[in-house]
């Protein structure tokens, strides 16, 4: 039973580890790759069949990276010939595996850990680079024992345990905060404080990259809530400079790069990102879509299979930008309007309402000259 949401609160009454029932219809994930991957891990261990579907964008995203290890654990999962959703899952009695991830992905890691809760024996996941550890912190918060994890690249758990109900305080999302951090960083005279933001060290690559570019940024009131570090983030405008981004920071800022590309477009000099091929299989090909949009604004951009080079400029032009239904790209170009000499219109923005309800109102409150255009 789920009660709410009510004033930001949601109450969930659990049914225990063996209490889930077969869904009566396909489960629609909308545009959420995270939801699909996490539920795939959970459903792979259930004694029933289920089907996961999504919107047009999600249905074009490759899911082989979770299907392969889940199949090794014993699940049967069918997709399209292209390896994309819909995903038909026939649950099974799973066995734990040792899995070396070829690409750092918190979603793949989390999917396997959730499947491992029900598996016989130990499920061990090793990541090639440190990535987000929210799932590990959450499971520990629910009383489940894990070994390893951040700052080590290996984490494991033994199946068959139990989860204990707990209260969770969800901090403000740093991926959403990134748009406002960049907005302040590129707007002369801006001073901004964002309160109670999650600053999990596996997520703060955006802060480190902005610092290296010259942003005037500090943390206050640092504390830990529900196993997650939180803080108030202060940022003041300061001239930014182009940098070569350390590839080690890529998994720590993977969802923030659309906003960071806008910062790079407003910086003095050239910013180079490599080792970020993961950006090509997000809600859109974020390397190409961002490059196309920045070029429309007059920015010199070079793309690579695994990254991008952006030559900053003192001002941007105006244009009509196709976000390709990618919420983060839509919000990034909204922020770019702060340095544009004429109007920027962003198309296909409907998914912004899913990931960041109230973005337009909050952006207007922060000082952006922004309005929604009815279809």
Language model region names:
Residues 1-375:
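Structural preference for solvent-exposed beta-strand-turn elements
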């Amino acid at each position: 039973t789920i009660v709410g949401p009510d004033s930001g609160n949601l109450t969930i009454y659990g049914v225990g580890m063996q209490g889930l029932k077969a869904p009566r219809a396909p489960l629609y994930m909308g545009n959420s790759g995270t939801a699909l991957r996490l539920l795939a891990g959970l459903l792979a261990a259930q004694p029933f069949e289920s089907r996961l579907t999504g919107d047009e964008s999600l249905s074009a995203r490759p899911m082989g990276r979770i299907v392969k290890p889940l199949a090794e654990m014993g699940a049967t999962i069918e997709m399209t010939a292209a390896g994309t959703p819909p995903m038909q899952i026939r649950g099974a009695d799973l066995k734990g595996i040792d899995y070396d991830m070829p690409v750092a992905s918190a979603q793949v890691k989390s999917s396997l850990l959730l499947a491992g809760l029900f598996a016989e024996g130990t499920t061990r996941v090793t990541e090639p680079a440190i990535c987000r550890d929210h799932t590990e912190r959450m499971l520990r918060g629910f009383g489940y024992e894990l070994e390893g994890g951040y700052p080590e690249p290996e984490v494991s758990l033994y199946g068959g345990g139990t989860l204990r109900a707990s209260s969770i305080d969800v901090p403000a999302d740093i991926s959403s905060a990134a748009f406002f951090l960049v907005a302040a960083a590129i707007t002369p005279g801006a001073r901004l404080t964002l309160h109670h933001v999650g600053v999990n060290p596996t997520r703060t690559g955006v802060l480190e990259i902005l610092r290296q570019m010259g942003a005037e940024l500090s943390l206050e009131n640092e504390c830990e809530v529900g196993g997650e570090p939180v803080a108030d983030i202060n940022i003041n405008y300061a001239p930014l400079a182009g940098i070569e981004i350390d590839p080690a920071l890529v998994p720590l800022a993977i969802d923030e790069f659309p906003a960071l590309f806008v910062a790079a477009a407003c910086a003095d000099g050239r910013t180079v990102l490599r080792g970020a091929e993961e950006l090509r299989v997000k809600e859109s090909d974020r390397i190409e879509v961002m490059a196309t949009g920045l070029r429309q604004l007059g920015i010199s951009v070079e793309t690579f299979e695994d990254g991008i080079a952006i030559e900053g400029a003192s001002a941007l032009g105006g244009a009509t930008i196709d976000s390709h239904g990618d919420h983060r790209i839509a919000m990034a170009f909204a922020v770019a309007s702060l340095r544009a000499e004429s109007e920027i219109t962003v198309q296909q923005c409907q998914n912004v309402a899913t990931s960041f309800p109230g973005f337009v109102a909050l952006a207007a409150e922060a000082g952006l000259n922004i309005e929604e255009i009815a279809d």
